[in-house]
């Protein structure tokens, strides 16, 4: 079941869902608007192949900055953080969606990482890309996406109880940690 506005507000006020900082005016009929943070990370263009199982290539040739705004050039991909940190209980999951007004500028908010498991705690890393033919400027603090909350049965092993919860407690835009997976698939 998708939570509606009064359910979202009630669960946040009771501490069942934690959102910091919380602005009641960001609650929509079926979602909570989230804002862009100020930490950005991107790959420097080059020929180095990124191997998801090799942390050295994942972390090599990146730049990062903290800024009040950033210009996304056409085709530019970067990671950003949400201003809000969240904490989900073991019976609530969330999905992140871009705001249509931002999408209409050509800015995608996430590539495929739009699911937030029950038990997650931290900021959300956004996988942003400008598919417009023109540069687009985005600002820290601007509403950039929406969280949709779903009530589920209680998870037996919520994200915060998993031994391999790679992104638990992240507090800024975080590069892929795929290399922490137990084994490489057989080639």
From Swiss-Prot:
GO terms for molecular function: dCTP deaminase (dUMP-forming) activity; dCTP deaminase activity; nucleotide binding. It comes from the Archaea. Keywords: Hydrolase, Nucleotide metabolism, Nucleotide-binding. It catalyses: dCTP + 2 H2O = dUMP + NH4(+) + diphosphate. GO terms for biological process: dUMP biosynthetic process; dUTP biosynthetic process. Its EC number is 3.5.4.30. The record marks 114-115 as: Important for bifunctional activity. The keyword Hydrolase applies. Coiled coil: none annotated. It is an enzyme of class 3 (hydrolase). The keyword Hydrolase applies. DCTP binds at residues 99-104, 117, 125-127, 146, 159, 166, 170. Gene3D superfamilies: 2.70.40.10. Pathway: Pyrimidine metabolism; dUMP biosynthesis; dUMP from dCTP: step 1/1. Belongs to the dCTP deaminase family. Homotrimer. Bifunctional enzyme that catalyzes both the deamination of dCTP to dUTP and the hydrolysis of dUTP to dUMP without releasing the toxic dUTP intermediate. This is dCTP deaminase, dUMP-forming. It comes from Methanoculleus marisnigri (strain ATCC 35101 / DSM 1498 / JR1). The lineage of its organism: Archaea, Methanobacteriati, Methanobacteriota, Stenosarchaea group, Methanomicrobia. The gene is dcd.
């Amino acid at each position: 079941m998708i939570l509606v506005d009064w359910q979202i507000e009630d669960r946040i006020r009771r501490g069942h869902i934690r959102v910091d900082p919380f602005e009641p005016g960001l609650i929509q009929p079926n979602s909570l608007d989230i804002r862009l943070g100020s930490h950005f990370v991107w790959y420097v263009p080059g020929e180095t192949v990124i191997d998801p199982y090799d942390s050295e290539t994942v972390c090599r040739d990146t730049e990062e900055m903290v800024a009040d705004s950033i210009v996304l050039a056409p085709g530019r991909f970067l990671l950003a953080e949400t201003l809000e940190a969240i904490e989900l209980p073991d019976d609530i999951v969330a999905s992140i969606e871009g705001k249509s007004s931002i999408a209409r500028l050509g800015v995608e908010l996430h590539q495929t990482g739009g699911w937030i498991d029950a038990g997650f705690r931290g900021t959300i890393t956004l996988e942003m890309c400008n598919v417009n033919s023109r540069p687009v400027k985005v600002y820290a603090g601007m509403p950039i996406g929406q969280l949709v909350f779903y009530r589920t049965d209680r998870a037996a092993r919520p994200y915060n109880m998993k031994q391999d919860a790679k992104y638990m407690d992240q507090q800024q835009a975080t590069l892929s940690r795929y290399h922490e997976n137990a084994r490489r698939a057989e080639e």
